[in-house]
A protein has these predicted regions:
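Conserved pre-catalytic core of RNA-dependent polymerases
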Residues: 1-98
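Short linear motifs embedded in intrinsically disordered, charge-biased segments
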Residues: 57-60, 71-94, 98, 105-377
Length: 377
């Protein structure tokens, strides 16, 4: 997905699952993992790709000069090894390497890439989606042939399969085969930092975001719990380092009250410890927030969702994220029973709370102004 963010890929996958879950139609996904991604790119393939992409010759020569005659040594417990040449792969740690790798992946798979969200590439994170196992097996076989014929290799143990059995029916064998070997089946997969569950729920991701927030908080507890540091400064540090870790990916959530409450409880525990208070002190949450100048995370989550909604609505009709959001499930009626909560429904509720409608989204400045949640002073 050139020029796209991780959030667009996560959003497309979640929205596709919502639509198929609503119609009770199954989805099958395979998350491809490449062995030693950067170390396996043959140099001749790299030069061939640069030529195919019509990269100017002077730039190709500069890149070749960077890679010619490269030597390295390895530090061991017994000291440094002797120098030895590296004749395969792209340079580790080079800012140019991700771009070169992306060019290689795009060129090698150009003829077999499907449109998003059925096929999404983000660097070396690849997900293939299909309505049937047979179709997914066929796609996986084509990707294996395209990549392994040029020297790359798909991992037989880390490539994973997830079945979204929204129809609740039992089919035949659920194996996805890679080179004669059955790949592992997972109920949950971590994709671009966000946890995707086979039932389309977000409980794992909510728990992971809370844990990520605590990891950041504990790593900075020497500052956040220091009584000599002003509460206002602690609040600024929290808003810069901890809260972003908790909010990553929340704009794509079809969030329920229980999820928002769980996030809010975790945040209040952090803020109380920062100010040196416990619940036994019987100080209201609003007073704690006023001291550190931090708005409720539930409201910041709503701001993030509406900001993301506005971003999507303003995109042109041919944008990947727009077309993916408009995917329809043909020939299937909605199943019986109460419909599951969707991201679109949550957005409608958010707009109702603020008294706004989607006609306002085209005015970006006004939209951002109306949805903004200011931290208390």
């Amino acid at each position: 997905m050139p020029g796209r963010s991780t959030m667009e890929a996560i959003f497309l996958l979640r929205r596709l699952m919502e639509k198929y879950r609503e119609k009770k139609k199954d989805l099958h996904m395979v998350f491809i993992d490449l062995e030693k991604t950067y170390d396996k790119v043959p140099r001749q393939v790299l030069w061939w790709v640069l030529e195919k992409k019509k990269v100017p010759t002077k730039y190709v020569e500069v890149i070749k000069d960077m890679y010619e005659g490269v030597l390295t040594r390895v530090r061991t417990v017994d000291g440094m090894t002797g120098e030895f040449p590296i004749t395969i792969g792209v340079h580790q740690g080079s800012s140019l390497s991700p771009y070169l790798f992306a060019l290689v992946m795009d060129e090698l798979t150009y003829n077999i890439q499907d449109r998003a969200p059925w096929c999404m590439l983000f660097a070396d994170d690849i997900v293939l989606v299909d309505e049937t196992r047979e179709g997914l097996n066929s796609k996986l076989g084509m990707w294996r042939n395209a990549l392994e014929s040029k020297g790359l290799r798909l991992s037989r143990t880390k490539t994973e399969y997830m079945e979204c059995n929204f129809s609740k029916t039992r089919g035949g064998p659920n194996d996805i085969i890679l080179d004669g070997q059955t790949i592992p089946t997972k109920d949950v997969f971590k994709y671009l930092g966000s946890f995707i569950q086979q039932d389309g729920a977000i409980e794992h991701d909510v728990n992971h975001r809370i844990k990520a927030g605590w990891v950041k908080w504990r790593s900075a507890s020497g500052v956040l719990c220091d009584p000599k540091i002003p509460n206002r400064l602690k609040g600024k540090f929290y808003k810069s380092a901890v809260r972003p870790a908790m909010l990553y990916g929340t704009e794509c959530w079809a969030v329920k009250k229980q999820h928002s409450h769980k996030m809010g409880v975790a945040e209040m525990r952090m803020l109380r410890w920062m100010t040196g208070h416990t619940r036994n002190d019987r100080i209201r949450n609003e007073e704690i927030r006023r001291k550190v100048e931090v708005a409720p995370i539930e409201e910041k989550m709503r701001e993030n969702r509406l900001r993301w909604f506005g971003h999507i609505q303003r995109r042109p009709m041919d944008a990947v994220v727009k077309q993916g959001d408009m995917v329809q499930v043909p020939g299937v009626r909605r199943g019986k029973g109460r419909p599951k909560l969707t991201w679109g429904t949550v957005i409608e509720k958010d707009m109702a709370v603020l008294g706004i409608n989607e006609n306002l989204v085209l005015d970006r400045c006004e939209w951002r102004k109306r949805i903004h949640i200011a931290d208390p002073n």
